[in-house]
């Protein structure tokens, strides 16, 4: 007679073993209809799962994040059902849930076209609207293997052979004549899977190994209702308009090319943004009392072996050789900073020592993962390392947190998710040391009134860490900032300081990044602003235009005044209609367009118009200079009308 305890603390007793769905039905018909799965004693299970002993139970519906993920996983199975009907020779590989959707890797002789994807989506909808029950059968390993071998599903057989223990009991999910294998749970009925959209295809190697066969990966999104689906598709449409690759080309910021994959060719205007960002971060470094250093791009393999990077990152490092010595181009700055710390005897009075670098790093990312500025091989880290004593950790981390929030607020990022990752099973150092370190990070977050999620066991083997994830205007997540304690690297590379007791001690090292990669952050900013950069970052801050040749000299005078005042301005003296010039510079997102006619010239004024089309009226040139300089120096987010 199992007693089921519900989330509100109420209890229900049943005569016999009872399914999750039965419990939902005992509460109400509406809940039974909405029930996708259950969480029994903390574990997600199918709605058909029998509960035989006393247990806690939460009913999972499509309103829950877990319910949405289950629904998406079932849509992957639905894709398999449909593709096997349209192309029976297809071999199914894996079909997991991803952010906002799912994908399935399939082995199919023909390349799927756009028309094929449309036909596949139509068949999926046709099947889903039959509202058939999904039937789960738990079988032996051998039974599962026999099922898939009889259907020539070689990838499923390989998964069984290589990934599933012989004494395991795989779950087979029956979608009418189609069978798929999964841990589950899945929806009990396909009425939950009506709102989806297939999005794109790409290539993907089986097992992610380039030595294996290239499969076709079909991506889709799925939601609980039509409203959510349409809202997501609208966000995607807006994201496409904001794509930094498209805007970067339109505004002539940078380009990439095949001869240097993952390396950025910065054009003049893009490089202006880069340097302004660098100047801003340098200002923060001065405010927070950092030294700025510059380490070499390339160091001997021996050093990377001592640091431990060679064992863990060798595949991601570019290497070269000279005079019988092997070198690696640095993928990160930290070993170089320890070398700088090691020059000269350090005392406890020298700590904390805060060392920052705009380090040019390179990582041999797979070519298929490269994506504009967001995923590159050559990048610049706004990296810093703080060498401190253990009793200084909390104060230093607290200062790092303030610096992170201070920086992000300048760009208008207010929705910041924070995670604290604690000790993993395999780690160095004593439990007492980890206790103190984790408490220091937690206390620093609490001291700054920062809410955070705990991620037990997710820290690095050498120390706990804090991660800062930005959410942009489209609610996309970008993990940028990190504060990571390191108890290992200083000792491995021989870093010590003399303590108050006159003994040698190994400093704690705090790895700290705010923007992460300068390139990636510029990509994020480009998409966040849709190319409407704040005035201080805009490559061209004002363009001055004449109406007739009569004002040409006056325009040049205005431009000179602006430039001498530190405002990036250019003249447009082309023999074109003023409306044409304004439209062209509006498309270039120039913040201010200044128009000079005879009246303005005679009055020593300028007519001011913004890139959003707002007429701000006429200004004395000196007054306009004062206003623009104020906007630039205070780094306001938007020009006046925005």
Curated annotation (Swiss-Prot):
UniProt catalytic activity: tRNA(Thr) + L-threonine + ATP = L-threonyl-tRNA(Thr) + AMP + diphosphate + H(+)
Top enzyme class: ligase
Organism name: Tolumonas auensis (strain DSM 9187 / NBRC 110442 / TA 4)
Cofactor needs: Zn(2+)
Cofactor note as given: Binds 1 zinc ion per subunit.
A single GO BP: threonyl-tRNA aminoacylation
Region (Catalytic): 243-534
Assembly description: Homodimer.
EC number(s) given by UniProt: 6.1.1.3
GO cellular component, one term: cytosol
Subcellular location as annotated: Cytoplasm
Keywords (A to Z) from UniProt: Aminoacyl-tRNA synthetase, ATP-binding, Cytoplasm, Ligase, Metal-binding, Nucleotide-binding, Protein biosynthesis, RNA-binding, tRNA-binding, Zinc
Residue numbers binding Zn(2+): 334, 385, 511
InterPro entries named among the record's database cross-references: aa-tRNA-synt_IIb, aa-tRNA-synth_II, aa-tRNA-synth_II/BPL/LPL, Anticodon-bd, Anticodon-bd_dom_sf, Beta-grasp_dom_sf, TGS, TGS-like
Name of the featured protein: Threonine--tRNA ligase
Domain TGS: 1-61
Function: Catalyzes the attachment of threonine to tRNA(Thr) in a two-step reaction: L-threonine is first activated by ATP to form Thr-AMP and then transferred to the acceptor end of tRNA(Thr). Also edits incorrectly charged L-seryl-tRNA(Thr).
NCBIfam families in alphabetical order: thrS (TIGR00418)
Source superkingdom: Bacteria
Family, as annotated: Belongs to the class-II aminoacyl-tRNA synthetase family.
Gene Ontology terms for molecular function: ATP binding; metal ion binding; threonine-tRNA ligase activity; tRNA binding
